[in-house]
Amino acid sequence: MTKSIDFYFDFISPYSYLAYQKLKTLNKDNFFKIVYKPILLGGLHNLGGITAPAFNVRKMKNMKDDCKLIADKNKIQFQWNDNFPINSLYLMRGYLVIDENLKKKFFEVCFDYYWRKNIDISNEKNVIKILDTCSINKIDFFKDIGNNK
């Protein structure tokens, strides 16, 4: 029986990206199944009454330094995104509504664009590039996430 790991993520979380890259390395032989569970990190911060590191200068500096250390130590390609933080609501909704067979690619491309290529994934033109890369129907995607563009 294959064990599974629930992986809670938000595309805007550098720690989600770094943890996912480490999990991929640990699971290169498919010893366990990763069950992806999208969350809204900003919502968790609000629920807990926590000021997100993005809005506190000291926390932000520490987080950037910490992420660089983690990436370097684990040989993970990582670039801090100049647009951090963004509103990831539509992309996270998108992950929930796209075809099950496309989720893994969508997941990878969103993380890759944001945390490796420094691309603003909240920008509609870039979202369309992501959708094209993943062969996801743009009209259906925007309709399904409640953002009829």
Where are these regions (language model features)?
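C-terminal cap of thioredoxin/glutaredoxin-like
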Residues: 2-6, 15-32, 100-105, 109-149
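Residues immediately within or flanking Cys/His clusters that coordinate Zn2+
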Residues: 10
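Structural alpha/beta surface segment adjacent to cysteine/selenocysteine redox centers
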Residues: 17-117
